[in-house]
């Protein structure tokens, strides 16, 4: 464990030295913020079984609290170090979570999810009704370079902002991991798995959910404060359903069953919203397709896939699947290429018709009005799907056989 934490700290420390471009620094800072946010969300979803559709409320209000304090500092009314603004956001998130959590955590399951959805929509609608606090449609802007520099650090350069975010990311990640091993964290798992039994032995499940809800609100409020420092502007979008949906979607894609899953999901979120959105206008469609595939074939997320294969590697049986993995990757690449060609041709016809019938896809020029392009892409898609299904069935058979061999090996070890 110490090795893993040391490696994590080294990655945070060395990352800006390896990825030196302006785009890379932008993505790294956003990844740090997203890691805290997704880990906080997973305290509810993965550890507590609470499906929230309004978690952005607490990060967003944390952002607004931080930017109001930052403007007070800029006006000379208050004296708060910029490096402590994330804690201001955290306290704001904690306070709001305490107020709203007293209501939302009275119920669990579907009712809890619907209550959080309603609260999220309520706060977003209030953002348009209270321009004094939320800044109206334009939001509230500020300047993070205020106050006296501390040891020459002004937080003007993006590198200084990154390392501030990196410190908070590391500390918050350690604290949230430590929470999973506390009595409250263990009891939260019990409430998720069997709330009736927890009630039977004398614990108040609503109180357990409430405390976890407040802690999650504190950490995502810190993420909101870091958002303020990084972007220097906060709009009503930060409390919207789109942001809450992103936390849910990418936490699930990363894997809610393992602690490091939301970290993977956070990295994927930034890659999708920053890189993929610049590469294609159909990025949301691709994201939706990827989500459907993961739900159907890997509901445990990326981290679930990693842990399953690590288990096979521990028994020395992973090498039996290399051929199948290569076949799956090859056929999946064919399917993705065909889907990409068809989707991009449709988008080109609908959105870029004035630019002519030709488009470029992966370095190749394609005529969107030519029948050969459509026939070829359709044939490639049908062939790829058919081959993928054949390979998948063979893979499932191999996987089942390996699981039986592992069970037999476990029985043999127990007998000896």
Model-derived features with residue positions:
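Transmembrane alpha-helices and adjacent helix-loop boundaries
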Residues: 1-416
